[in-house]
Amino acid sequence: MTNIQALFERIAPLYDRLNDQLSFGLHHVWKQMAVDWLELPQGATALDLCCGTGDLTRLLARRVGRQGRVVGLDFAAAPLAIARQRSDHYPQIEWLQGDALAVPFAPQTFQGITIGYGLRNVVDIPQALREMFRLLVPGGRAAILDFSHPQTSALEQFQQWYLQQWVVPTARHYGLAAEYDYLWPSIQAFPTPPTLCALIQQAGFERVKHYPLLGGLMAITVAQK
């Protein structure tokens, strides 16, 4: 088990509560935006990589309806167990423990793919992007939601302050300070928007659009095969 995998096993029971508190509920809006930008029709097939407790997965299921098919994949068992408990009303969802770098499906299986706050945590970002490209049908779209690099130095300073002075102390209240302390260095190591878009194009995608949120504190990047 990797360090990141073990981290998500530990934080799973409180992950959603902390997301609500730390984003003031805005993560729900951003996840819905990511799903909407895929423009999936009813009956479509979709994949949610690094699905965690399944917020995005369930939004995809609502989008494609009961005639569609959605797979939620994560490498950690604990968040998947929570996701399964919450999916009684979503028979179109299949939950799967697996690796985002080697997804066990044939090429051109899915019409849409989401990955929310997951690409930053994989050990090989280019390989994850190549897998998304492989799995999509021609014309299919992938939506990547994650922290990003702010557009101004003032916002970057705010981002660092917010993470170190609000996020980590809030997590400390739940005994998870060490688990959330990794966020700031992980964001610093994440590709900048131009680099990320270039990596997506190198993976084979033809159209890439980057949408900064809150001045670039967060972003959704949409790529079409």
Swiss-Prot record:
Keywords, in A-Z order: Methyltransferase, S-adenosyl-L-methionine, Transferase
InterPro entries per record: MenG (IPR032904), SAM-dependent_MTases_sf (IPR029063), UbiE/COQ5_MeTrFase (IPR004033), UbiE/COQ5_MeTrFase_CS (IPR023576)
Reaction(s) catalysed by this chain's protein: demethylphylloquinol + S-adenosyl-L-methionine = phylloquinol + S-adenosyl-L-homocysteine + H(+)
GO molecular function term, any single one: 2-phytyl-1,4-naphthoquinone methyltransferase activity
GO biological process terms, semicolon-separated: methylation; phylloquinone biosynthetic process
Involved pathway(s): Cofactor biosynthesis; phylloquinone biosynthesis
Enzyme Commission number(s) of this protein: 2.1.1.329
Family as reported in the entry's similarity comment: Belongs to the class I-like SAM-binding methyltransferase superfamily. MenG/UbiE family.
Function: Methyltransferase required for the conversion of 2-phytyl-1,4-beta-naphthoquinol to phylloquinol.
UniProt cross-references to NCBIfam families, sorted A to Z: MenG_MenH_UbiE (TIGR01934), PRK00216.1-5 (NF001244)
Name under which the protein is recorded: 2-phytyl-1,4-naphtoquinone methyltransferase
Underlying gene: menG
